[in-house]
Amino acid sequence: MSWQQRIEQALEERQQSAAYRRRQVNQGGNGRYIQLNGEHYLNFSGNDYLGLSQNAQVIAAWQQGAQQYGVGSGGSGHVTGFSTAHQVLEQQLADWLGYPRALLFISGYAANQALLAALMQAEDRILADRLSHASLLEAAAHSPAQLRRFRHNQPQALADLLAKPCDGQILAVTEGVFSMDGDSAPLAELHRLTRAAGAWLMVDDAHGIGVHGEQGRGSCWQQGVRPELLVVTFGKAFGLSGAAVLCDEPTAEYLLQFARHLIYSTAMPPAQASALQAALHCIRQGDELRARLQDNIQRFRQGAAQLSLTLTESVTAIQPLLVGDNQRALDLAQSLREQGLWVSAIRPPTVPPGGARLRITLTAAHQPQDIDRLLEVLHDVSV
């Protein structure tokens, strides 16, 4: 089979299974409203949970940072790309989350990949929740360590794997809030098990940080857990992009020496680090925003229950409406768009076969009438 035949066959298979992905051109903003293809929609697909991507303080901080530092970092943090703005942000994150150190990465994907690539060796073992993010599972599969996946959110399944002998070190990997189902991991029990076994726990809290816990400190803080490795990302509640790894002092120094994703990537723009400082301030003072988000979640779930909609058990901003069939999910998403609502259809391989869904995400920027409109249209399209 030639290169061209291989590529065309793969594309044809995706199209035939109604799993073909297409990008949409966003022409303005990603907040309560979104403009796509020349049309305005109520946006129920974004991850900007607190509305900070449109926050005036955050925008002004970025502009001021650009005036001070320019629009780019100019290099890796190991060369000339590590600025005062980066240093201050790392210290603020470490103090806020109760860790000795924080290290910035250009994305959550890069942070997850870097940790597993740098830390794991051939005699080690990774125990990953079966529904962990693609960045975690891919990095684990490509690492020299052995990968074993345990049943989703089942501590006993993890305990069984921890009991098996291992010549090296064991790292258990999970998420704080799972991106496709919106459910939360039993972090306290998982950490109890890993500590007892002498293993480490790594938590990717991309969807929990900023939203859960005191001052938005996330899922781990909410459950009274401080894992050995905590990854927080800035593309959701922070309203920007990038990520940080929270860890102890020796691990941070080790990563600075051996994490290739950190060493060989251009650092995030200092202006972005300045904006993230402003976003962190908003999050720490954001009890009202978090309360508004929780009100929206409760309003939606109560209305969905009255309509007998099939949702997951999520009590987070991620509210998946289970459909099953790929084409049916696409058709429903199109019906919602025709009524001015933007909701994404999620299909395999992002979710398991037969697990197609509308991934509804709620934010603090939504108004009660927005939630009511969404429920009204869902009722009309006969989900």
Curated annotation (Swiss-Prot):
Catalyzed chemical reaction(s): 6-carboxyhexanoyl-[ACP] + L-alanine + H(+) = (8S)-8-amino-7-oxononanoate + holo-[ACP] + CO2
EC number from the UniProt entry: 2.3.1.47
Signal sequence segment: none
Keyword Transferase: yes
Residues at which pyridoxal 5'-phosphate binds: G108, Y109, S179, H207, T233
Subunit structure and binding partners: Homodimer.
PANTHER family: 8-AMINO-7-OXONONANOATE SYNTHASE, CLASS II AMINOTRANSFERASE/8-AMINO-7-OXONONANOATE SYNTHASE
Protein name as annotated: 8-amino-7-oxononanoate synthase
Species the sequence originates in: Serratia proteamaculans (strain 568)
Gene symbol of the encoding locus: bioF
